[in-house]
């Protein structure tokens, strides 16, 4: 029984280590240089209003995508509502009747 438990602990440790190597683990910080180690990434809210009226999904963007964006459309009451939030390499172009707001820091399109 102890051998099985030890094997599971070793397996979990190996799996967590390999997840960090491929970028699936949490961000690692070099304390001496005070900067992130590995491929740079940012986090943006990523959701579609049709699927989720409240946007609570905040996810890690693909490496190289440093722009968070929110697309707005008129709501019929004289105002506008967001319809899509996500990340991209560059700020997307607004379509007819749309407005796009882009920002360039982590979690900046949350509201």
From Swiss-Prot:
Main location: secreted
Entry-linked InterPro entries: Snake_3FTx, Snake_toxin-like_sf, Snake_toxin_con_site, Toxin_cobra-type
GO CC field: extracellular region
Top-level taxon of origin: Eukaryota
SUPFAM superfamilies in the cross-refs: Snake toxin-like (SSF57302)
Function description: Potent postsynaptic neurotoxin. Displays readily reversible competitive antagonism at the nicotinic acetylcholine receptor (nAChR).
Protein name (database record): Toxin 3FTx-Tri2
Gene source species: Trimorphodon biscutatus
């Amino acid at each position: 029984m102890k051998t099985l438990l030890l094997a599971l602990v070793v397996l979990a440790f190996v799996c967590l280590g390999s997840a960090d190597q491929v970028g699936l683990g949490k961000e690692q910080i070099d304390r001496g240089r005070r900067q992130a180690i590995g491929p740079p990434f940012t986090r943006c809210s990523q959701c579609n209003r049709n699927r989720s009226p409240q946007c609570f999904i905040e996810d890690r963007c693909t490496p190289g995508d440093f722009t968070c964006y929110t697309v707005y459309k008129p709501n019929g009451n004289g105002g506008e509502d967001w319809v899509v939030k996500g990340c991209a390499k560059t700020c997307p172009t607004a379509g007819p009747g749309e407005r796009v707001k882009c920002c360039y820091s982590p979690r900046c399109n949350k509201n």
